[in-house]
Amino acid sequence: MIEEQLKVLKVMNEVTSRIDMNAFAQMVGLNPHQTIERMQELVNAGLVKKVGGGYGITEKGKAILQVFAPVPKDAAFHFYTAIGQPTGFSAESLKDFYEIVKRVAVESLEFHLYREDFENWMKAVFKDAALANELANLKASQLKGEDLRQGILKAIAAKFGF
């Protein structure tokens, strides 16, 4: 169901003029009844709002799209434990990043946080100074190990509602 909701959000974000529900449903790849159900779920989640006789995507909805949007291959975040020691993990979206942070070695998190790699990636790739600042605050708190992992996950979850 999350895939269908994401598809609805993506199409809503791309559509530049009003269209009827049947045409929208066709663009999404669902029948009109399923499309209305997904729209209502998105309204309930605060990702879409009713606007006049139609719907519009909210800022929260746009933020969720950003989480799942892939970055260009050359902008992916590659996790290392030290210079020249890759972990084999690469994040090509914020969602990827979040999932990798859950399982990568804490040595990698410590390596990147204290080099400011995470905050620089957030600013450069996502233009997200607020999240970059949250990550910088973790560095200032001098968190280590699992506390650091939980701090990073919490910062991302708070921003995007995971």
Located regions from the model:
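A short, conserved structural fragment
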Residues: 43-53
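Short, amphipathic alpha-helical interaction segments positioned at domain boundaries
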Residues: 59-85, 105-110
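Amphipathic alpha-helical packing elements
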Residues: 108-141
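Short amphipathic alpha-helical interaction segments
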Residues: 3, 29-44
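Long, highly charged low-complexity segments enriched in Glu/Asp and Lys/Arg with interspersed Ser/Thr
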Residues: 136-162
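Short amphipathic alpha-helical interface segments
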Residues: 1-28
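Short, cationic-aromatic polyanion-contact patches
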Residues: 1-5, 20, 53-72
